Design a protein with these regions (language model features):
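A short acidic, Gly/Pro-enriched loop at the edge of an enzyme's catalytic core
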Residues: 101-111
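Conserved class I S-adenosyl-L-methionine
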Residues: 41-50
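Conserved alpha-helix/loop element of class I SAM-dependent methyltransferases that forms part
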Residues: 23-40
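Short, glycine-/aromatic-enriched active-site segment of Class I SAM-dependent methyltransferases
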Residues: 148-169
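A short SAM/SAH-binding and catalytic strip from SAM-dependent methyltransferases
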Residues: 110-127
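Class I SAM-dependent methyltransferase SAM/SAH-binding core
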Residues: 53-101
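Conserved Class I S-adenosyl-L-methionine
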Residues: 191-256
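A short glycine-rich, Lys/Arg-flanked "PGG" loop and its adjoining helix->strand segment in the class I
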Residues: 127-145
Length: 256
C-alpha cells in the first residue's frame, strides 16, 4: 500500500470534524475576523485557502464582500465549493485551483495566508516565509490588511521537537523575528496572537491523529490498518514527545 493511500485516510479535506486546517478556536477566529475588519464590499483573497472556512466567515462578516480562495488541493476545492453553495455564497466566494505563488491579482482590501508559506519557493523555509509576506503585501491596496499565519518557536527547539515537526534548525524563528520580517516588507502588526496548547491539542486530536485512530478502530481488518496505525504512532511521538509546548502558529493581522 502506498503512502498516498495512508495520507488519503488521514487527509484534512475529508475530515468533517475539522472546521479549518489549523489550530484555531472559534473565539480566536472571531477575534481575528474582528481585527481584519473587512468593510462592506471588501475584496478578500486567501492564498492557500484549503476549503475556505475562514475566507467564507470573513466574507459573511461584511455585506457585499467577495472572496477568492486560491488552492491546489482538489478535495479541498470541492469541499469549499460545496460549503459555499450550501451557505448561499457561491456568487461571492470563488475557488481557483492555482498555486498561491502564481496568483497575480492585486488591489485586495485583505489578503490571507495561514500556514501556507511553503507555497512560495525559497532556498530555505525562512526565505519562503519572506517571499510569502512580500506577495501578500503586493496583493493588497495601500492601507489594506494582511492576515498571516506562520509557525514559530516559543523556546529553543530540542532535537525531538525538530524531528517531530520535520524542520531544520533555521526553518522557523521567534515571534519577534516574524514580526520584524513582516516589517521588512512594509507590513506593520495591528494584532498578534498565537495558538495556545488547548487549540493545538484539539487540532491534533480532531486532525490526522484523531481521524486516523477513529478510522483504525472502525476498520481493524483493512489492509491499510497496520500502516495507518504506524503513522498515528509516529505523529503522536512527534507531537506529544516533540514539539508540543515549544512550536506554535502565530496569527499576525498586519496593515500595509
Amino acid at each position: 500500500m502506498s503512502a498516498e493511500e495512508v495520507r488519503a485516510v488521514m487527509s484534512a479535506p475529508g475530515n468533517d470534524r475539522l472546521v479549518w486546517n489549523t489550530p484555531l478556536s472559534e473565539e480566536h477566529a472571531a477575534r481575528l475576523i474582528a481585527a481584519c475588519d473587512p468593510a462592506p464590499g471588501a475584496r478578500i483573497a486567501d492564498l492557500g485557502s484549503g476549503w475556505g472556512e475562514l475566507l467564507m466567515r470573513l466574507v459573511e462578516s461584511a455585506p457585499g464582500a467577495t472572496g477568492d480562495g486560491v488552492e491546489t488541493d482538489p478535495d479541498a476545492v470541492a469541499r469549499g465549493r460545496k460549503l459555499a453553495g450550501e451557505r448561499g455564497l457561491a456568487d461571492r466566494v470563488r475557488f481557483h485551483p492555482t498555486p498561491a505563488a502564481e496568483w497575480t491579482e492585486d488591489g485586495y482590501d485583505l489578503a490571507v495566508s495561514i500556514g501556507s508559506s511553503h507555497a512560495w519557493p525559497g532556498a530555505t523555509a525562512r526565505e519562503s516565509t519572506l517571499n510569502a509576506l512580500t506577495a501578500l503585501a503586493a496583493a493588497v491596496r495601500p492601507g489594506g490588511r494582511v492576515l498571516f499565519g506562520e509557525g514559530i518557536w516559543q523556546r529553543e527547539p530540542t532535537p525531538a521537537a525538530l524531528e517531530g515537526i520535520g524542520a531544520e534548525p533555521g526553518d522557523f524563528g521567534s515571534l519577534l523575528e516574524l514580526i520584524r520580517l513582516a516589517e521588512s516588507v512594509g507590513l506593520r502588526a495591528l494584532q498578534v496572537t498565537v495558538a495556545d496548547e488547548r487549540e493545538w491539542d484539539l487540532f491534533e486530536s480532531e486532525g490526522p491523529i484523531g481521524r486516523g485512530q477513529r478510522w483504525a478502530l472502525a476498520n481493524p481488518d483493512h489492509p491499510l490498518h497496520a500502516e495507518v496505525t504506524a503513522e498515528i504512532d509516529a505523529r503522536r511521538t512527534g507531537y506529544y514527545g516533540g514539539y508540543r509546548s515549544s512550536f506554535t502558529l502565530a496569527y499576525l493581522v498586519l496593515s500595509s
